[in-house]
Amino acid sequence: MDMGLTDKLAVVTGASKGIGLATVRALVGEGATVVAGSRSSSPELEELAGVHSVKVDLSTPDGPERLVDAAREVGAVEVLVNNVGAVTPRLEGFLAVTEDDWLASLNLTFLAAVRTTRAALPNMLAAGRGSIVNVSSVNAFLADPVVIDYSAAKAALSNFTKALSQELGPRGIRVNSVSPGPVSTALWLGDEGVAATVAQAQGGSPDAVAEAAAGQMATGRFTTPAEVADLVVLLASERAGNVTGSDFLIDGGLVKTL
């Protein structure tokens, strides 16, 4: 199936690993040129052809603008994937989450998307076309005190997606989001990931924590980064030409409500 992405320029944030890296791979596989923004690069990212890697701190007010400026040197941005984000389990409760913790979560997980979108949008508006895909989370609507600041930031991102789609739809620009459940990335399964952090605090092993999480899903397993990336690429493509303002769960059946 031709996704109509050949020779289009895409910007992907949080691109050096996990869902971001998988999305870069998938876009390149569809013939797109990608400007990949991340705080640090990775060998896996650097080895990909058709990728312009930009080292940038997207949690800062000027980082997103610098990323988009670098993309403009390559061409006109037609696709934006706002993927960057981070989560820290707050196992000591709400009162232990400091002002700095809240600001860090909001800056990276929500405001980075706002700022990158704001920087990329003028060129899309001038062209009268474009697609923005925001990587949200099931935690946008599954309230969990263990990730309270992350959940609030993702809820803001999902609301931002819906609201912006209403403004930009008449001007040829689509805005959608995907909401993964647990994904088999370092965010969950790494040495400092969610499973390891919870295991250290509560006892047991990271593997046992991960198995318990997987057991809550109808499929009994974590989603892979490539599966999320495939959904992102579909939404970014011309195959989803009349899809906007929508959020797509990819959670293995974790969410049981209608």
Region roles according to the model:
Residues 9, 16-17:
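Conserved glycine-rich cofactor-binding loop
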Residues 90-94, 98-106, 132, 213:
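Substrate-binding pocket helix/loop in short-chain dehydrogenase/reductase
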Residues 91, 221, 232-233, 244-258:
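Short C-terminal tail/terminal secondary-structure segment
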Residues 117, 153, 161:
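Active-site helix of classical SDR
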Residues 122, 166-167, 241:
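Alpha-helical segment proximal to the catalytic Tyr-Lys
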Residues 137:
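Residue(s) in the substrate-gating loop at a strand-loop-helix junction
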Residues 169, 174, 243-245:
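Short, small/polar-rich loop/turn modules that mediate ligand/substrate recognition or access, typified
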